[in-house]
Amino acid sequence: MSSVTLVSITLAAVIALAVGLLIGFALQKKLHQNNLDRATQTAEGIIEAAKKEAATLKKEKLLEAKDENHRYRTQLEDELKDRRTEVQKSEHRLNQREDTLDRRDDTLDRKEQSLADREANLNKRQQQLDEREQDISSEISKQHTELERIAELTHEQARQQILDQTQSELTHERAVMIKESEDEAKEAADKKAKVLIADAIQRSASDIVAETTVTVVNLPNDDMKGRIIGREGRNIRTLETLTGIDLIIDDTPQAVVLSGFDPIRREIARIALEKLIQDGRIHPARIEEMVDKARKEMDDRIREIGEQAIFDVGIHNMHPDLIKILGRLHFRTSYGQNVLDHSIQVAKLTGVMAAELGEDVTLAKRAGLLHDIGKALDHEVDGSHVEIGVELATKYKEPKTVINAIASHHGDVEPTSVISVLVAAADAISAARPGARSESLENYLHRLEKLEAIANSHAGVDHSFAIQAGREVRVIVQPEKLSDDQSVILARDIRNEIEKELEYPGHIKVTVIRETRTVEYAK
């Protein structure tokens, strides 16, 4: 009984559960349907609202497009209006130009017609002149024939006679004019030059010491000579090879002589040798070390000398390499005169004269200091010291006035400024003053012979004499061959030839002597 009851209860429970599930499913479906209906209604509302909003937005965009289209059309109309106005103005200008061209065309036509008329008149006058010229030529020919008959001279003979007479008169007048002009120019120039040069010289004084090709190094004792020579002469050979200088060791007590034509190498050898003597250790390795130190010391010394030179002169802004080259001039000589001292003196003289003439004093000093800069390298580089100096000044971008002063101070080119002329004058003053330079006997004799040869090469010269150590040449002429006027021209020609062919310090006086003697004996 109990098992049947349990089954019944279980079955009832299952049925109740099934019925509950069916009822729950039905309720769930109903609820889902209601939610779906509400969602559908909401979606339809959203769609409807979107449609309304889209319609509104469409209307707004259409209105904006219409406004934009209206503005664009208005802008186009304004631009078209402006373009029409500009075109009208251009048409007006073109019309005006066309009218102007028409008027010019008319004017040219009138001028062309006028020129044609003038050409016709000129042709007519030319024809008349040709006819008249023929008549005159015929008349002149008749007159020539008549003159030849009367004068008993042909046309060529008369022409030659007139030319000879005219040439004689012109020669006399030219000689007189040359003498008067030279006298006036010399008088005025001498007065001004004497004032300038005297002032420049009295404000610039310097000592000039002649250099030689040898240097003497003192030794503490004669035993040092053997140490300098070294075993089998290896020390002296090493020193000579490294410096390029000859060491002369003779019987002179406590001294050795360094001989060489390059003063810089000779100075390097002197410094190295003195350091070796002071150190006491003399062997090839030590010699090489001391020579290297001497070269470095020499480079520093050259730079310091160059800097001191530009400081003494009072110039600045010079390229460092050019300053070192300038310092090398201290170890160069010209006819026994120290080139750097000479350059400093020229710079100061040029500056004084430039100040008197109102020129740029600093630029004048710069040109004077650098005028012989090429001599620092003329033994190492091909070319004259003038050419080398111009190349150096151009390389280091010196002013054009300085370059021209370097190029023209020996007369190789024409000076283009007053400063260039002053540099040449100062160079001559510094070189020509007594004691500044020495000259070899061979060169001196050659210059005297050349002076006399130049004078004797001219026609009408009897003989000549170079006197006063070559500062004057006296020319004796044959009076029957040369007149007084021709003597003036002869002196000028000899002067020009001397200036062209000879190099000399200062100036040379040319004196032409024409003497006529008449002797009669009373019996």
Swiss-Prot record:
One Pfam family linked to the record: KH_1
InterPro entries: HD/PDEase_dom (IPR003607), HD_domain (IPR006674), HDIG_dom (IPR006675), KH_dom (IPR004087), KH_dom_type_1 (IPR004088), KH_dom_type_1_sf (IPR036612), Ribonuclease_Y (IPR017705), RNase_Y_N (IPR022711)
Residue ranges of every copy of the KH domain listed in the record: 213-276
Stretches for region Disordered: 81-136
A biological process from GO: mRNA catabolic process
Localization in the cell: Cell membrane
Enzyme class: hydrolase
GO cellular component assignments: plasma membrane
Domain HD: 339-432
Keyword terms: Cell membrane, Endonuclease, Hydrolase, Membrane, Nuclease, RNA-binding, Transmembrane, Transmembrane helix
Enzyme Commission designation: 3.1.-.-
Main location: membrane
Top-level taxon of origin: Bacteria
Summary of the function given for this chain in its UniProt record: Endoribonuclease that initiates mRNA decay.
Cited NCBIfam families: HDIG (TIGR00277), RNase_Y (TIGR03319)
Family, similarity comment: Belongs to the RNase Y family.
UniProt-recorded name of the protein: Ribonuclease Y
